[in-house]
Amino acid sequence: MSTPDNHGKKAPQFAAFKPLTTVQNANDCCCDGACSSSPTLSENVSGTRYSWKVSGMDCAACARKVENAVRQLAGVNQVQVLFATEKLVVDADNDIRAQVESAVQKAGYSLRDEQAADEPQASRLKENLPLITLIVMMAISWGLEQFNHPFGQLAFIATTLVGLYPIARQALRLIKSGSYFAIETLMSVAAIGALFIGATAEAAMVLLLFLIGERLEGWAASRARQGVSALMALKPETATRLRNGEREEVAINSLRPGDVIEVAAGGRLPADGKLLSPFASFDESALTGESIPVERATGDKVPAGATSVDRLVTLEVLSEPGASAIDRILKLIEEAEERRAPIERFIDRFSRIYTPAIMAVALLVTLVPPLLFAASWQEWIYKGLTLLLIGCPCALVISTPAAITSGLAAAARRGALIKGGAALEQLGRVTQVAFDKTGTLTVGKPRVTAIHPATGISESELLTLAAAVEQGATHPLAQAIVREAQVAELAIPTAESQRALVGSGIEAQVNGERVLICAAGKHPADAFAGLINELESAGQTVVLVVRNDDVLGIIALQDTLRADAATAISELNALGVKGVILTGDNPRAAAAIAGELGLEFKAGLLPEDKVKAVTKLNQHAPLAMVGDGINDAPAMKAAAIGIAMGSGTDVALETADAALTHNHLRGLVQMIELARATHANIRQNITIALGLKGIFLVTTLLGMTGLWLAVLADTGATVLVTANALRLLRRR
């Protein structure tokens, strides 16, 4: 058992292409299923956090059984099983690892260290031996009954007992661990009851169908987890590190920021890296959904899991172990399971009432007719047992999480990361979208188009001063000014006391003097008023360079519209989703972009103004806010759902409920379509699960169906629900 690690802060959840340290807090539950196993420790009110990988789970109901087993232990504050990644997470006041492992084992499952290699799969024959044995015994029993009825009955009893033994043993384990109404318990009671009333053939058939259903559910669950498994497989196990001019093969966990690695043509990056080679093409489709290889130049960042298409490349490692793009997406998947949709929480609560209620109905059906109306005991005991099997909530329990997990996985394949079912549900309801302009509707790489200095200062001096203040800033306009100075090979002085003025600009001390870079209109500039008006009317953005309250000049910049912006807006309109631009830019520059796209706009907004605008719009209909900067974060928080562009700042990415990693606006359209398809899928699944139960409830009471058909209906509903959810993965 490995020693717990100490962690202290939380990594941005959407910074899929930024090198950041991954941290686990006891308040940050990972919930999806790719478990790390060595228990991890966090110092906060929730005590210590431990995590393991769980083996033996076939469906979401299994995850709940493990949770129930651990929840009964003293000292446990919180427990959650992330089915998609097969991970158990426990927050406890003290070290209870041994007790947790014992409790899970008693419930019929096993735990292993998170860093341990996956257990080798059992052979097909060994895995299916109980099912094969039961099928053979059933065939023999049927044959014997045809020739000798008493011997056939004895054979069916023997078959039932052989099939019942492992199921009843598991039922007892689950009862001891707190799962009183598990399907194993219902099956055991039904099979024993069927033997009691002489329905030996049906008792055996019930168990056979149950085992077949378990195998089908296991297969469906593995298919649902394939997306996560494929993502985990993107990272190679080893990397080639260059040290002192020599190559060495090392495990990827030993890589640290600053290490230099080589990746051969066709090889995958083991960590996020900065390209040191002159240029190269990378296939990033597994992470972003971008099918065309991406060209990268020296200094560009490349995410872990990307494939070098055509040449040997050298990179500098940027990410810590466990903090690469792939790790952060897996972390997101885990967190997504914690942020369950309201409908999922409702179904979970309903299913907890549903099974005991059906059992009570079954008991009444068994007792009332014989006691009050002198009906046949055998007939009504049989009907009561059949109702017991109808009471299994498996299909209902997985109806929502199966669809949501598939929807989230399908979105991730297309480069859209969504923070869980709650965000997915909100996204499906969106009927209007508010866009930031710079970096969202535009490429976010503006260029300097004009420099107009005041009398007594040259263009190069003005640009140098502006670049000194803007150096290190993340805003696209700031980067454009610095880039222009670098291209002109100007010597940029070091600025001190740099401070961002949210919604206004940025200021710093340069050569002992206060210099402010701000938007036109944020500071008086009468001498340049006519020129500013002319430039803004042409759709350009103008910034002022102010030193000690004196305007030294203006710099004009212009961005280009994203290539797919017009198409995305048109497709959103076709979905009945209206768009509006909310920007801090000047009204004339905003009007130029809005005119090209046919959108309404509000310009010159401070962050608080954006929040007010979003709040007002959100009152009329659910609104999504799409942005990429620090000034967009408050508005994203105020919207029904915030969506960040993948190239955005860490603040925007953390605040957002979803992100487009590939920076294509058409991904927003696909995201909304997928969210709506997921909701339709959930409704279909609930209809299938409850509809089949309702039909067989009626037919059972009318005496039209019996035990084995009830099991078939339960198994069939579970398989149908899972298969229907998997359709989302094939959606294009």
From Swiss-Prot:
Gene: zntA
Protein's organism: Shigella sonnei (strain Ss046)
Cytoplasmic topology ranges: 1-124, 168-179, 223-356, 405-685, 730-732
Residues the UniProt record annotates as site (Important for metal transport): 693
Keywords, sorted A to Z: ATP-binding, Cadmium, Cell inner membrane, Cell membrane, Ion transport, Lead, Magnesium, Membrane, Metal-binding, Nucleotide-binding, Phosphoprotein, Translocase, Transmembrane, Transmembrane helix, Transport, Zinc, Zinc transport
Residues bound to Zn(2+) 2: 392, 394, 714
Gene3D superfamilies in alphabetical order: 3.30.70.100, Calcium-transporting ATPase, cytoplasmic domain N, Calcium-transporting ATPase, cytoplasmic transduction domain A, Calcium-transporting ATPase, transmembrane domain, HAD superfamily/HAD-like
Enzyme Commission number(s) from the entry: 7.2.2.-, 7.2.2.12, 7.2.2.21
Catalytic activity: Pb(2+)(in) + ATP + H2O = Pb(2+)(out) + ADP + phosphate + H(+); Zn(2+)(in) + ATP + H2O = Zn(2+)(out) + ADP + phosphate + H(+); Cd(2+)(in) + ATP + H2O = Cd(2+)(out) + ADP + phosphate + H(+)
Periplasmic side stretches: 146, 198-202, 378-383, 703-707
Gene Ontology terms: cellular component: plasma membrane
Protein residues bound to Zn(2+) 1: 58-59, 62
Domain notes from UniProt: Has two high-affinity metal-binding sites, one in the N-terminal region and another in the transmembrane region. Both sites are able to access and bind metal ion independently of each other. The N-terminal metal-binding site is not strictly necessary for activity and metal selectivity, but is needed for maximal activity and may be involved in regulation. The metal-binding site in the transmembrane region is essential for activity of the pump.
Ranges for domain HMA: 48-112
Its membrane topology: Multi-pass membrane protein
Active-site residue numbers: 436
GO molecular function: ATP binding; ATP hydrolysis activity; metal ion binding; P-type cadmium transporter activity; P-type zinc transporter activity
A Pfam family that the UniProt record links to this protein: Hydrolase
Protein family according to the UniProt entry: Belongs to the cation transport ATPase (P-type) (TC 3.A.3) family. Type IB subfamily.
Outcome, altering residue 714 to N: Lack of ATPase activity and strong decrease in zinc binding
Cited PROSITE patterns: ATPASE_E1_E2, HMA_1, HMA_2
InterPro entries per UniProt: ATPase_P-typ_cyto_dom_N, ATPase_P-typ_P_site, ATPase_P-typ_TM_dom_sf, ATPase_P-typ_transduc_dom_A_sf, Cation_Transport_ATPase_IB, HAD-like_sf, HAD_sf, Heavy-metal-associated_CS
Upper taxonomic lineage: Bacteria, Pseudomonadati, Pseudomonadota, Gammaproteobacteria, Enterobacterales
Full protein name: Zinc/cadmium/lead-transporting P-type ATPase
Residues that hold Mg(2+) according to the record: 436, 438, 628
